[in-house]
């Protein structure tokens, strides 16, 4: 542009700048259209795959009821919270599915909307419970908790999840929107080009780093009620705690992901046999790291911690962490700095009537 200023008169310089600006906007628009087309293509391929599976099972006449062993009649739902190491964990499930003989399915919602419409809730519940060809199944996606019992389902799925320190999660998400990660480095992100650091955003009172953006893990566990998404709702916090204890099989934390995987392998070997060793030996390939991430200053953290929203999200995180550590303490023993799963610690006796 310096050369243009020397060679061109002012009017032509202005025209050149305008043309350049229009060209940039045009290119950004074309890139956005390509991304939308790619998303539509992915959804079309997924629908085609589903139809192919259904056609294979109806080609020879009416669909036969598939009798499943009790061990195979299991569905796990991992309603993953964004930026909690969810991709790292899900990749392990994909790597193990062929070996351990189960199916992995991604729940791809339009624009990553975590709240399903009522009609989609009905469809989803019906799919998950009646799609026997996909059992045992591991479903994952950015979807808030859905209570299957309200739809009259006899056998509910097993819910699992992972959560993260709320400020660390927000910082990671902030930079992810701008710079992406090492998983798909070439993909253009929504905020790409915005070089403002998280500290600068907080200091300026920006919307992308506002305390309201912390409100995510609570509504994901609270569910599909309107009050769950009312930022700062004490009812939503208590409902999220209730669901975590009563509706989730296990909830881990990002900071102790290996222990979470170890407990799942011990309790649900049908799905997770070999997961701990895979995580340990393949750590570099499974971990997904946000690029260009800068840790926030103490001043930035202190400012966010003044928010009532942070206090509530942190209360939920501490509640989940305490519960996870309680479960772990009763499932493992430590020796020489290593954790080992406890053997079966109960047995049956005094069995009557006596067999002859």
Curated annotation (Swiss-Prot):
The chain crosses the membrane at residues 12-28. Changing residue 94 to A: Preferentially transfers sulfates to IdoA units. Residues 24-51 form a coiled coil. Its EC number is 2.8.2.-. It is found in: Golgi apparatus membrane. It is a single-pass type II membrane protein. Disulfide bonds join 201-209, 222-228. GO terms for biological process: gene expression; heparan sulfate proteoglycan biosynthetic process; heparin proteoglycan metabolic process; ureteric bud formation. GO terms for molecular function: heparan sulfate 2-sulfotransferase activity; identical protein binding. Glycans are attached at residues 108, 127. It comes from the Eukaryota. Adenosine 3',5'-bisphosphate binds at residues 83-88, 164, 172, 279, 285, 290, 293. Residues 1-11 are cytoplasmic. Residues 29-356 are lumenal. The active site is at residues 140, 142. InterPro entries: Heparan_SO4_2-O-STrfase, P-loop_NTPase, Sulfotransferase. Changing residue 140 to A: Complete loss of activity. Belongs to the sulfotransferase 3 family. Catalyzes the transfer of a sulfo group from 3'-phospho-5'-adenylyl sulfate (PAPS) to the 2-OH position of iduronic acid (IdoA) or glucuronic acid (GlcA) within the heparan sulfate (HS) chain and participates in HS biosynthesis. Homotrimer. This is Heparan sulfate 2-O-sulfotransferase 1. The lineage of its organism: Eukaryota, Metazoa, Chordata, Craniata, Vertebrata. The gene is HS2ST1.
């Amino acid at each position: 542009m310096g050369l243009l200023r020397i060679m061109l008169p002012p009017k032509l310089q202005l025209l050149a700048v305008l043309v350049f600006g229009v060209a940039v906007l045009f290119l950004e628009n074309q890139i956005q259209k390509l991304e939308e087309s790619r998303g539509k293509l992915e959804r079309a391929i997924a629908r085609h795959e589903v139809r192919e599976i259904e056609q294979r099972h109806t080609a020879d006449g009416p669909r036969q009821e598939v009798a499943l062993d009790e061990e195979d009649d299991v569905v796990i739902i991992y309603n993953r919270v964004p930026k909690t190491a969810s991709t790292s964990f899900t990749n392990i499930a994909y790597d193990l599915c062929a070996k351990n003989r189960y199916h992995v399915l991604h729940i791809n919602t339009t624009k990553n909307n975590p709240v399903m419409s009522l009609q989609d809730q009905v469809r989803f519940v019906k799919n998950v419970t009646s799609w026997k060809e996909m059992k045992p199944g591991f479903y994952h996606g950015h979807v808030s908790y859905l209570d299957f019992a309200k739809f009259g389902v006899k056998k509910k799925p097993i819910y699992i999840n992972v959560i993260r320190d709320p400020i660390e999660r927000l910082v990671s998400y902030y930079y992810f929107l701008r710079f992406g990660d090492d998983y798909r480095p070439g993909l253009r992100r929504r905020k790409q080009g915005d070089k403002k650091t998280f500290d600068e955003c907080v200091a300026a009172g920006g919307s992308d780093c506002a305390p309201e953006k912390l409100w995510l893990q609570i509504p994901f566990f609270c569910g599909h009620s309107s009050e769950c998404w009312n930022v700062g709702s004490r009812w939503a916090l208590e409902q999220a705690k209730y669901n975590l204890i009563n509706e989730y099989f296990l909830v881990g934390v990002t900071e102790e992901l290996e222990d979470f995987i170890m407990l799942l392998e011990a309790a649900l070997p049908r799905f997770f046999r070999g997961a701990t060793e895979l995580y340990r030996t393949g750590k570099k390939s499974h971990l997904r790291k946000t690029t260009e991430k800068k840790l926030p200053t103490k001043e930035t953290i202190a400012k966010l911690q003044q928010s009532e929203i942070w206090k509530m999200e942190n209360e939920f995180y501490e509640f989940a962490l305490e519960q996870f550590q309680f479960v772990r303490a009763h499932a493992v023993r430590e020796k020489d700095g290593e954790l080992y799963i406890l053997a079966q610690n109960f047995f049956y006796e005094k069995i009557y009537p006596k067999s002859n």
